[in-house]
């Protein structure tokens, strides 16, 4: 597993292919927007009379018409024309004017260079692409006249960002490229911040599931593909249409004879991978980041979940788009950013390979059995830096001193963790242990080289520690000695000129100056060697020939020290890059170790268990719980009610009835989430669990309309149901809620019945089918694998108590009027509803057997869906057990306490259920 990521390969620059015209996709972009958007000046010629700087702007804007141009001018990035108007509106900053263009003032806005990342973050999140234009020479040191040379140094797009402040520490930042070859799609996704690079071949029908699993920041794909809710993330179309050329260029990029050394790639996958690399290279102005080789992952080996299932289960995103009250938030005990990302990846792509699942379980299980070691390991991992992303920035030439420090600190943490894991280990931990060992000279060199603490920016100086480089120390000594001379001169000048308050200060534009108060100005004007340079409201500034010479010496020494420090820093970066593969593998090992300790921490409470994983179709859970709801209830007065689930071979379809608010939806979701956790290799919230590997998971719980696509709630429900019936198989798990609602009662009942039959008899999937159509419980005789269950309810003196407990048996009421009362429906309306319900129930007396419902001409299990049902199955007249008749005759209702009455009712129910199972009577659940 780790071997796939260990061998990070240095990419070689490849011939630059012709770059097609790009079309940026800011929010709400359209053809109309394009003519008035970021690129509206693309065809504008350089106007006569333009200043040299503005002439540069026009040239660069014509090269990057669809990006906002961050044009460096001194300490600001300036934006002009439509760029300025778009940026000012997005950033809520002031729009000003500068100069004229064709007789009109030029719109302008700007952001400070030191705060640019904050503004970039807001623009990128709104979907803009930004071209960064830097000054390519120092204004102070350049020779000759004319404008400062400027050029675009990079394009910042949602899928190609690397800055720590722009990235979400807990989520990958993926660029996804999709191409088409014949009837197959090829997808390639990469994260330049960590080096991840993977591909997959899929049908177009699997596209939304892929998008839901990856949640990419930016998508490159043909305009003919419909991305639905991800369309706002669509990047410029940049097609690659020659698979042979794509394979050859990929092989050249990785310096191999053929890309098949990395695995088997379809033509579409190869073209998608090359498209992604081209886009990244263009965004980095020809440079390529350190990327692992492309890994074809394929669809096999992962639990398949479509987009609606992911949304329904709120795995890592809640319905409101946030991350709270999700499965990830409920189980996360990771201590590092990389560990958080890996845990999210495990939950987003659970496995179907029992061997790999078991290896993960063995890893956290071993840590669980070593509590003292685990505690020390957590202390070691706490505060571990994000080595992978630091390495990515260093490889791109944008590494900061703190990125070098992150590699240093991460290496020390890895060494300490490796020391803790010495000895006999399970295979999962043994593999990690091997990857934690970096070449010892690397952390030693970084420890000796870097100052502590390191500054945030290289420009601030002081990155390299004293004593590491003799030449740098010498230049710093000259600079610092000259500064000591300045301090001595201040004392000498104050005494010589009789001005006790005289100060020598450095100014960015003037250099070192003598500053005196106003009362001393006239006296110093008469001193021949002093030259007045600047008057001030409260004094004046003078210079002196000796001071000017010292200023020159200090400036030159400081510049030599700066240049030498840059040489040393560059050497450190190169040393880090030389070990990039080992560092990347170490970073992944630390992340995996963090996930395993998180799982062990979760299991420490004793209320989470290690599920038994098998390749059969069993799915049994003892005292299972919904992890998110349980976490929300923690500390409150009401504990979560655990429930069992038994979908073993002889009872693999569970028909669940019961009232609203009784917990049906929670129960459905909790079983799906337990399967996800189990197949991610993690503990599950249950006393015990036996999970036969699920290949596809479908959750249709809680539907809503899709106004953007013009679909009603019922249409959305039917579309999702159709997907289940087409894609589910014998190894699938299907949890569905209220199939058939949103239409007439008979239509809904007919649809629910037909779907239930298909899942039971044709597909054979493990199924939990929640419904308010209580009549479906009568299908138990027709569908041998079906078992009815209901949510238990207690009623006393007109009040209903929902017990949130699943019990075997069929429910007879939905308690909708009681729920309406609890919801605050006016009392008069509730009373009227109760009267109408009573009347309707009385009218329906005698119409409750199958013979009186034409709909219940049940098809037999061996009939196909297209065959009409034949025959009406008569229900046998109900006969009460003699024991029950005798007990009723002896009962004295007026002498019973409420508790005795309730116990007696449950006893009667048990007697009825016992006879119902023998086929003599149908029992109604109380």
From Swiss-Prot:
Which residue intervals are annotated with compositional bias (Low complexity) in the record?
Answer: 26-40
Drop me one GO molecular function for this one. Answer: damaged DNA binding
Q: Which domain of life is it from?
A: Bacteria
A Pfam family assignment: MutS_IV
Q: Which GO terms describe its cellular component?
A: cytosol
Q: Where is this region: Disordered?
A: 16-40
Q: Which NCBIfam families match?
A: mutS1, PRK05399.1
Function description? This protein is involved in the repair of mismatches in DNA. It is possible that it carries out the mismatch recognition step. This protein has a weak ATPase activity.
This protein's name: DNA mismatch repair protein MutS
What is the species of this protein?
Answer: Granulibacter bethesdensis (strain ATCC BAA-1260 / CGDNIH1)
What lineage does UniProt assign to this protein's organism?
Bacteria, Pseudomonadati, Pseudomonadota, Alphaproteobacteria, Acetobacterales
């Amino acid at each position: 597993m780790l071997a796939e990521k260990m061998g990070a390969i240095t990419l070689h620059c490849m011939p630059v292919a012709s770059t097609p015209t790009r079309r940026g996709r800011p929010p709400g972009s359209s053809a109309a927007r394009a003519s008035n958007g970021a690129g509206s000046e693309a065809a504008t010629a350089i106007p006569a009379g333009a200043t040299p700087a503005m002439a540069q702007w026009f040239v660069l804007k014509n090269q990057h018409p669809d990006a906002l141009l961050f044009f460096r001018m001194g300490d600001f990035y300036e934006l002009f024309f439509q760029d300025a108007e778009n940026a000012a509106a997005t950033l809520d900053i002031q729009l000003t004017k500068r100069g004229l263009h064709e007789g009109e003032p030029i719109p302008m806005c700007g952001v400070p260079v030191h705060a640019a990342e904050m503004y970039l973050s807001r623009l990128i999140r709104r979907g803009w692409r930004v071209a960064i234009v830097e000054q390519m020479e120092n204004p102070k040191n350049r020779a000759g006249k004319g404008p400062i040379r400027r050029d675009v140094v990079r394009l910042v797009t949602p899928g190609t960002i690397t800055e720590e402040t722009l990235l979400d520490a807990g989520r990958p930042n993926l660029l996804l490229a999709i191409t088409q070859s014949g009837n197959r799609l090829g997808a390639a996704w990469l994260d330049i911040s960590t080096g991840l690079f993977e591909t997959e071949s899929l049908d177009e029908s699997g596209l939304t599931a892929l998008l839901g699993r990856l949640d990419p920041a930016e998508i490159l794909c043909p305009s003919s593909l419909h991305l639905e809710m991800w369309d706002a993330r669509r990047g410029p179309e940049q097609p690659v249409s020659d698979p042979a050329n794509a394979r050859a260029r990929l092989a050249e990029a990785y310096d191999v004879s053929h890309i098949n050394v990395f695995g088997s790639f379809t033509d579409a996958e190869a073209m998608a991978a090359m498209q992604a690399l081209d886009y990244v290279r263009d965004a980095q102005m020809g440079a390529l980041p350190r990327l692992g080789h492309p890994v074809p992952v394929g669809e096999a080996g992962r639990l398949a979940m479509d987009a609606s299932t992911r949304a329904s289960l709120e795995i890592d995103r809640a319905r409101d788009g946030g991350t709270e009250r999700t499965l990830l938030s409920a189980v996360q005990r990771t201590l590092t950013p990389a560990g958080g990302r890996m845990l999210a990846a495990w939950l987003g792509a659970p496995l179907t390979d029992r061997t790999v699942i078991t290896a993960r379980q063995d890893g956290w299980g071993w840590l669980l059995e070593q509590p003292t070691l685990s505690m020390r390991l957590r202390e070691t991992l706490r505060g571990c830096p994000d080595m992978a992303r630091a390495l990515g920035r260093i490889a791109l030439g944008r590494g900061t001193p703190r990125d070098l420090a992150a590699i240093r600190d991460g290496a020390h943490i890895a060494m300490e963790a490796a020391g803790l894991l010495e000895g006999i280990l399970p295979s999962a931990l043994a593999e990690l242990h091997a990857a934690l060992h970096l070449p010892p000279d690397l952390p030693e060199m970084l420890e000796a080289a870097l100052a502590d603490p390191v500054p945030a920016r290289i420009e601030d100086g002081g990155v390299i520690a004293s004593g590491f480089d003799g030449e740098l120390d010498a230049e710093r000594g000259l600079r610092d000695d000259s500064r000591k001379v300045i301090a001595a001169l201040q004392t000498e000048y104050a005494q010589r000129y009789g001005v006790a308050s005289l100060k020598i200060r450095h100014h960015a534009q003037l250099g070192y100056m003598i500053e005196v108060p106003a009362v001393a100005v006239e006296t110093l004007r008469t001193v021949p060697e002093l030259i007045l340079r600047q008057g001030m409201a409260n004094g004046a500034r003078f210079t002196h020939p000796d001071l000017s010479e010292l200023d020159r010496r200090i400036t030159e020494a400081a510049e030599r020290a700066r240049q030498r420090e840059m040489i040393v820093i560059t050497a450190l970066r190169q040393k880090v890059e030389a070990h990039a593969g080992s560092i990347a593998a170490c970073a992944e090992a630390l992340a995996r170790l963090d996930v395993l300790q998180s799982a062990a921490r979760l299991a420490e409470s004793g209320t989470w268990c290690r599920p038994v994983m098998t390749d059969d179709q069993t799915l049994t859970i003892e005292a299972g719980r919904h992890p998110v709801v349980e976490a929300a209830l923690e500390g409150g007065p009401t504990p979560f009610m655990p429930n069992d689930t038994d979908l073993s071979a002889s009872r693999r379809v569970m028909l669940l009835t019961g009232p609203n608010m009784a917990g049906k939806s929670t129960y459905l979701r909790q079983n799906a989430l337990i399967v996800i956790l189990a197949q991610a290799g993690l503990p599950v919230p249950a006393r015990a669990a036996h999970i036969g590997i699920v290949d596809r998971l479908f959750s249709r719980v809680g539907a809503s309309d899709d106004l953007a696509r013009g679909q009603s709630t019922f249409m959305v429900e039917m579309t999702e149901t159709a997907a289940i019936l087409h894609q589910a198989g014998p190894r699938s798990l299907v949890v569905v809620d209220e199939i058939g609602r949103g239409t007439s009662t008979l239509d809904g009942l007919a649809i629910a019945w037909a779907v239930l039959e298909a899942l039971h008899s044709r597909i054979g999937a493990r199924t939990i089918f929640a419904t308010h159509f209580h009549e479906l419980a009568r299908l138990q005789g027709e569908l041998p694998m079906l078992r009815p269950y209901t949510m238990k309810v207690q009623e006393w003196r007109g009040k209903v108590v929902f017990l949130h407990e699943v019990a075997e048996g069929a429910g007879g009421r939905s308690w909708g009027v009681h729920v309406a009362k609890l919801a605050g429906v006016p009392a008069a309306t509730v009373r009227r509803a109760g009267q109408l319900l009573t009347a309707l129930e009385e009218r329906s007396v005698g119409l409750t057997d199958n013979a009186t419902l034409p709909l219940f001409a049940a098809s037999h299990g061996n009939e196909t869906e297209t065959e009409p049902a034949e025959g009406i199955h008569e229900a046998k007249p109900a006969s009460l057990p003699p024991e029950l008749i005798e007990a009723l005759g002896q009962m004295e209702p007026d002498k019973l306490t409420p508790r005795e009455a309730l116990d007696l009712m449950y006893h009667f129910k048990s007697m009825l259920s016992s006879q119902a199972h023998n086929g003599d009577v149908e029992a109604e659940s109380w």
